[in-house]
Structures are given as C-alpha cells and as structure tokens.
Amino acid sequence: MRNLGLLEITLLCSLFVYFRIDSVSSLNSDGLALLSLLKHFDKVPLEVASTWKENTSETTPCNNNWFGVICDLSGNVVETLNLSASGLSGQLGSEIGELKSLVTLDLSLNSFSGLLPSTLGNCTSLEYLDLSNNDFSGEVPDIFGSLQNLTFLYLDRNNLSGLIPASVGGLIELVDLRMSYNNLSGTIPELLGNCSKLEYLALNNNKLNGSLPASLYLLENLGELFVSNNSLGGRLHFGSSNCKKLVSLDLSFNDFQGGVPPEIGNCSSLHSLVMVKCNLTGTIPSSMGMLRKVSVIDLSDNRLSGNIPQELGNCSSLETLKLNDNQLQGEIPPALSKLKKLQSLELFFNKLSGEIPIGIWKIQSLTQMLVYNNTLTGELPVEVTQLKHLKKLTLFNNGFYGDIPMSLGLNRSLEEVDLLGNRFTGEIPPHLCHGQKLRLFILGSNQLHGKIPASIRQCKTLERVRLEDNKLSGVLPEFPESLSLSYVNLGSNSFEGSIPRSLGSCKNLLTIDLSQNKLTGLIPPELGNLQSLGLLNLSHNYLEGPLPSQLSGCARLLYFDVGSNSLNGSIPSSFRSWKSLSTLVLSDNNFLGAIPQFLAELDRLSDLRIARNAFGGKIPSSVGLLKSLRYGLDLSANVFTGEIPTTLGALINLERLNISNNKLTGPLSVLQSLKSLNQVDVSYNQFTGPIPVNLLSNSSKFSGNPDLCIQASYSVSAIIRKEFKSCKGQVKLSTWKIALIAAGSSLSVLALLFALFLVLCRCKRGTKTEDANILAEEGLSLLLNKVLAATDNLDDKYIIGRGAHGVVYRASLGSGEEYAVKKLIFAEHIRANQNMKREIETIGLVRHRNLIRLERFWMRKEDGLMLYQYMPNGSLHDVLHRGNQGEAVLDWSARFNIALGISHGLAYLHHDCHPPIIHRDIKPENILMDSDMEPHIGDFGLARILDDSTVSTATVTGTTGYIAPENAYKTVRSKESDVYSYGVVLLELVTGKRALDRSFPEDINIVSWVRSVLSSYEDEDDTAGPIVDPKLVDELLDTKLREQAIQVTDLALRCTDKRPENRPSMRDVVKDLTDLESFVRSTSGSVH
C-alpha cells in the first residue's frame, strides 16, 4: 500500500510538470521575441510591464492587449509595434529580427542607445521604420537590400556615424527618408537617385561632404530637400531638370561654389528657398521672379553682390525676404512694392543706398522692416504710421533724416523702434507706446529736440530706453512701475529738473545713465530699491545734497559715477554693501571728511576717483588693502596731509596714480614697488627725497615739489637729469681718492684713444667685423658682444620666430639671463635710420606691464638689433593654436585674463602715450606670454617706424584677417584699426579658431563667420553658445563664466563693427572688461 501511494504522488508531479512546460511553450514565437526584447530594456513603463506577461491560457500576444502591439486579422502574428514616446531606455535587442511579419516599427522619442541590430534586415515586410529621437550610435547597418517594401525610414536625431549605406538606393518604394541630426559622414550616395518615389529627403545637420549627386536633381517627385549644416560643396544645378514638385529647399551652412542657379526659377512650386551662408557669390538671378508660389526667400550671409533684381517683385506670394549680410548695393527696387503679402523685409548689413521706395511703406502686411547698417537715406514717410501689423522698425546706422512722423505708434502693433545713429530731427512722436507693446525705444545719436512724451509713464512693456546723444530737454517724465525695464540711457542731452523717483519702482533695472545733462536737486533715495542695478551714472549734472544712504540697497552695483556735480557731505558707511563695485567716481564735487575705512572692504574696486573735493586728513593705510585697484587711483586736488602710507606699495596692479595738489609730505620711496604704474602725478605737494627710478620713465609729473631730487647713480637721460637737482648728502671724496680717480680717468682716455686708432686702421684696411659695423655714435657694447657670442653671430639655429619686421633669435647668456633679439633689416638711406633711432629711443621709454619692454637697441649699418626679455610661453598664437598634446587646455579664465591684459596694454598706447602709438598689426603672433601667462604686446610702433626704412615693407600694413575693412587698401592706420584687430583676437579667444581658419569657406574670415552663425541661432541672448571653442564647453556650464563669454563675444562684435565710428575706444574696452570681471564674480546676470 505504501509503495502504491508513492507511485500516485510521482505520477501527479509528472503530470503537473508536463502541463506547466506545455503552458510556457504555448506562447508563439512573436510573443517570445517580445519578451526577449523586454530583457534589453533598462526602463520599462507601467503600461508595458503590466501587459507584456505570460498567460497560460493565451498562445499569442494578440489576445491579451499587449501595450503597443497590433496583430494581423488572424490574430496570430505581430504587424505593428508602436512604443513611441513611452519613456523606454536600454538597447534594441537582436530578437527584433524574429518579428518577420512586422510592417510598422515605431520606437521614436525614447532613450534607446547602443547599436542598431543588423537583424532588422530580417523584417522583410517592414514598410514604416521610425527610430528617430533616440540615442542610437555606431554605423547604419547595411540591411536595406532586403527591406524592399520600406516606404518611410526615420533615423533622425540620434548619434549615428559613418557612411549612408549605398543600399538605401535600392529602396524603390521609399517616399520619406530622414537621417538628419546625426554624425554621418562621407558623400550622399549617387544611387539615392534610384528612389524615384522619394518625396521628402532630410540629411541636414551631419558631416556630409562632396557635391550633391547629379541623380538627386532627377527625382521628379521630390518635394522637400533639407541638407543644411554639412560640408557639402560643388556647384548647384537646381532648375536644370524637372523640379516642378519641389516645395521646400534648404541648403544652408555649406560651402558650395558659384552662385544661386540661374535656372532656379524653373522650380515653380517652391514655397521656401533657404540658402543661408552657403558661400554663394555673384548676383541674384532674375529668374527667381518666376517663383510665384514662394513665401520664404532667405539668401542671407553669403557674398552676393550687385543689385536686388526688380523681378523679385513678381513673387506675389512672398512673405519673408532675407538678403541681409551680403554685399548688395544700389537702391532697393520699387518693384518690391508689388509684394502685397510681404511680412518681413530683412536687408541689413549690405551696401544699399538711396531711399526706400514709398510703395514698400504701403504694404499693409509688413511686420518687420530691418534695414540697419546700410547707407540708406531719405525721410520716414507718414505711410509707416498706417502699417497696422508693423512690430519691428529697425533702421539704425543709416543716413535717414527729417522728422519722425508724429502719428507713429497709433497703429498699436509696435514692439521695437530702433532708429539709433541717423540724422532724424524734430520731436519724439507721442504715441509710440499707444498699443502697450513697445519693448525697445531706441532713438539715440540723432538730432532730436523737445521733451520725452508724457505718455511714456503708461508704457509698462518697455525693456530698453536709449535716447542718448540728442538735443532733448525739459523735465524727465515719471516712469511706470515695471518689471521689464532693464536699461535706461538718457545721457548727453539737456534735461532739467530732478531725477524721477519712479525709477526706483522699476525693480529689474540694470543700467541707468543720466550723465551730461542739467539735472538738479537731490539723488532720490528710491533708487536704493534697485537691487539688480549694475551701473548708475549721474555725472556732469547739477545735483546737490548728500549721497542718500539708501543707495546701499543696490547691492550688485558695479559702476557708480556721480562726478562733476555739486554734491556734498561724506560717503555713507552703508555703502560697504557694494561688495561688487569696480568703479567709484566722486570727483568734482564738494565732499569732505576723511576717506572712510570701510572702502577697504570693497575688495573688487579697480578704479577709485575722488579728485577735486574737500577730503582731508591722512590717506588711510586701508587703501592699500584694495588689491584689485588697477585702472586708477585719483585723490588729487583735496586737502590730504601726512605721508603716503607704506601699505600703498601693495597695489602692485595699479596703473595710474594721481595724488597731486594736496598737502602730502615725506618720501616717494613707497611707490618704487608699484611696477605696473604707467602714469603718475604727485605734483604740488611737499614731497622730499629721491624720485624712484621706476617713475622717471613714465608719464610722471613731479613739479611743485622743490625738495625732490634724483640720485646721482641713476642711469637717466640728460633731459630728465636737467629737470631735477641731484640729491644732496653724498659722501665727500678725500684728496687722495680724487687724485686716484683723475689718474685712472687719464689712463682710460689714453686707452680709448688707442682703441679708436686701431679701429680706424682696421677700417682703412677694409677688415670687416660685426662690431665695426656699429655706428660710431652708438659706441661698443659689452652686452652686444655677449649676445652675438651666445648666438654665434646670429646663426639660424637660434631663430625662434620670423615676422613682418624681422627675425627673432634666442640668446642665453647664462645665470638665468634669457633674451630675445629681433634683427631689423634696413634700407640704405641713413637719414631714415637716424629718425628711427630717435623713434626707437622713444619706444624704449614706454613702460607697461602688458607691453614688451625694450631693454637695449643697437643700430648697425645694415640692420638694427632690439633686445627684449625672453618670453618662455611663446606667443598667444602658439598657446591658442599650436598647443602640444601634453599641454593643458587654455581655460576660459585664462583667456579672459589674456583679453583684459591685451586691452590694458593697447589702451596705454592709445591714450597714455603722447603722441598716441598706433600698433598697426595686432594679432596673436605679436602678443607674447610670460611664465605666468600674462600677455605682453610686442612690435608696437614698429610698423610706422619701418614703413620707410625696411626692405620688406608692404603697401598695406597689417595682417590679412586682422585688417579693418576701411584699411584694406590703405596704409593709413588709426586707433579704430587697432580696435578692429583686437576684436578679431577676442573672437579667436572665444572660438579657438584662427582669423582665417581652414574650416571657413574661401574668403570668409572669423568676423563674418561668427556673425553668420549668430544670425541664424535661435537663442539671441546666448551669443557664445554656437561659436564657443568646444574645449571650453564643460567649463562654460558655469552660468557666470558663460555669461562672461557671451559679453566678451558681444564686445568683440562691437570692436569689429564695419563702421570705425561705432567701435569702442580701447579705454572703453578696458572699462567693459574690468566691470565684467567684477560683475561676473557676484552675479550670473549682466549689465546691458
């Protein structure tokens, strides 16, 4: 009985196992394949996890409503797998190939990664394959030979690389192919022309090269073609074949040759023609007038020239016409007035002239008129006031004149009015903000008069108000309480009355400039409510009373200037909250009392000017704690007493010091440690003792201090020694010492005469030596002999550089003495050399921490030798563009400091040298880097000096890529030319690219490349994003550093403005960078 029981139990277990296994295996192959796929998914949404399950009663996934699964009519095989936008991640397993009846596969908008499985080729019934918007990588598998039914193929927006498989050309049923936004390379397959049913082709935003295949032009059904943002070249042939169905064509950001195809007019169905920055040349073909259906024409940022063809007026469906950033000239054709559907006319940055045809101002559909930076003239007609949809009227930097129509704004649609830099006269129209939409109110730099309309107080949408440099008068209106207003500049007018208190209610104001007016009364304490304010300039007015302590609420203030008013009292102690302040100007007022001790807490202060007040007492030692002081310290014309505090010697970065016209006493010895000083004025005090030798070569002023003297041991020019008496109290020599000196001198004279006799004898015999070639007035030099010995008489093996002005050698004299020797080759006219000698002696007196210091100069018959300290890190060009593999990447902070240092040096040449020195050839090769990566400008002054003296002088001075447009064919240079070159260097620092980079299309430089990229970039506030050096991407994830890069880019674009008068001075550049340096430390915002 017992054995029988065991047998029954065994049979029952066997049956259970049998039926269990049978139930598992009952799920068909498609179901098992799906479950296998599930194992490769990292993240599975609930809809999938809860429905993709084994069920003992079902044999197919079709009967249990598996999420995303659709089967055929029989309910046995899977035909559709649609998991689009399901939040899936992981990989696509090879089991996908087991779904052999699959017709539709849509896994788009997920986070799949890894390779595309080659087993997809087994899904031979596939008609629709969408794997777009994932993170697939690797090459596209060559599987399309077996997918003959494929009609829609979407692989766009992944990280796929490699070539486009030629087998795609065998997909004869293909209608829609999208592979854009990947990293595909190589050429577009010629076989793609076999896809005769193809209607939509998107290959944009890859790395494709070569020409568009000829077969592509034969696709008669092609309606939309997108190949922008590649490296395609060759000539374009659209219109030469049947393109009647082509609706959209975008070829932007490639490097094609030639111009717009003259036959393009044959593509009569075109709705959108976009060819931005394609390197197009030549003229705009008149055949484009045949495009009656086209609504968008964008040929911006090319090199198109000639006139705008009048035939464009036949494009009766045109809504957007963008021809900006080309070289178009002549007048705007009146035929454009026929474009009754035109909404946006963008012709800025060309060479257009004449008046805008009156008919264009009558196109009622116009929303944007952007024609700035041309040479257009004429008056603004009253018809502009009748454009009910006009949003943007941007005409700045032209030659428009006359009155602005008084009814402008009654059309209620205006959002931006920018007429800056024209010759408009008359009054400001009173209804500009009638529609309560106006954001930009910019009428600066015109000849407007009258008052600001009172209606401005109701305009709550304003963001920027610029009315500076006009002839406006009257009382400033009250401003509405606003959270959008960020910028107000009403400077350089004749406004009277008090500062509106209502400005204090505009909580997001970043900049207020009311300088150079006739404002009176007190500074309103309500301005202290502006917690984001970065710049407040109230200088050159008639303001009075004390500084309100409430201004301490402006905790982010960078720049505070109330100079040239009638303010009085002392500096409120509450201003210690200005921790970010970089510039403080209180000059030319009636302030009194001592310099407050709390100023030492403003450790980012780089410029302090409190001249011509009634400050008194001793200069506090705490001033020496202002380690960031660099641009200037001006305490002149006050009543300070006592000695200069020794702590002042800690201000090692200070470049300008003015303590003149006080009652200071004692020695100047503390100033000898200030190595960066390039301008000093200590005149009209009561200083005593020797003048520090480091100050004697600067633009220093010492008059009015009768007890100052020069040490007899100082090696200074005869002119300087003549101006000052020698210091007294030197040890009197005894009679026997005098006798010895006299005897020694006599022997020296005899030896010198003998040596001169030998030299003359050698010359008569025709013996040539290096020293014999030195001009007599220069004398012989022991140091020169050392230099020649160290370089084997300037042997080529010691060459470390060649430039436009000569060859540079490295001379190692031992004991750590390293020099760079520049050899200049002269022409044979000695008179020019004598002039050069005087000029170079002048250069030798120039001292600045960011300029290469000329140590010695020797003039010889055929050349001159200039001796400089050797710079171990080479040039900025070497550091930025030729970094060794092992070298660290030049990070953004270092690049910013380099930009700031160069600006300081160039500003000194332009504004602190008399006469000013124009460099003429600013470029990275002429900027040398010391061991601390501090930049030093070299070759300053040489371009002008050598113009008439060197063998190699060219007609046009400067280097291609750095020459300002106005100097392309001229030898005359100006400060503005240097500013342009500096702007190019800034762009190199931001982008990491050369001025003429190999990656640019032919004849494109870095300035035009940056402008073109930014013109098509969607985020107008992020000017650094699309151009920044890829090596900086990680570092610039820091919001503050990124903002700094954006502002530097904007500054570079201003420096490289086509019009010299629009460029900032180098002093302005220094100010902007210094303020930005401080501002970025404290906030991620920016001053606009």
Curated annotation (Swiss-Prot):
Signal peptide feature range: 1-26
Extracellular side of membrane: 27-739
Residue positions, PTM Phosphotyrosine: 868, 908, 962, 969
Residues the record marks as carrying a glycan: 55, 82, 122, 149, 159, 183, 194, 209, 229, 266, 279, 314, 373, 411, 537, 568, 658, 698
GO molecular function: ATP binding; peptide binding; protein serine kinase activity; protein serine/threonine kinase activity
Active site: 921
Amino acids binding ATP: 800-808, 822
Phosphothreonine PTM positions: 791
Main location: membrane
Enzyme's top EC category: transferase
First and last residues of every LRR repeat: 75-99, 100-122, 123-146, 147-170, 172-194, 195-219, 221-243, 244-267, 269-291, 292-315, 316-339, 341-363, 365-387, 388-411, 412-435, 436-459, 460-485, 487-506, 507-529, 530-554, 556-577, 578-602, 603-627, 629-651, 652-676, 678-698
Alphabetic keyword roster: ATP-binding, Cell membrane, Glycoprotein, Kinase, Leucine-rich repeat, Membrane, Nucleotide-binding, Phosphoprotein, Plant defense, Receptor, Repeat, Serine/threonine-protein kinase, Signal, Transferase, Transmembrane, Transmembrane helix
UniProt record similarity statement: Belongs to the protein kinase superfamily. Ser/Thr protein kinase family.
Function: Acts as a receptor for PEP defense peptides. Unlike typical immune receptors, senses an endogenous elicitor that potentiates PAMP-inducible plant responses.
Protein name per the record: Leucine-rich repeat receptor-like protein kinase PEPR2
Gene from which the chain derives: PEPR2
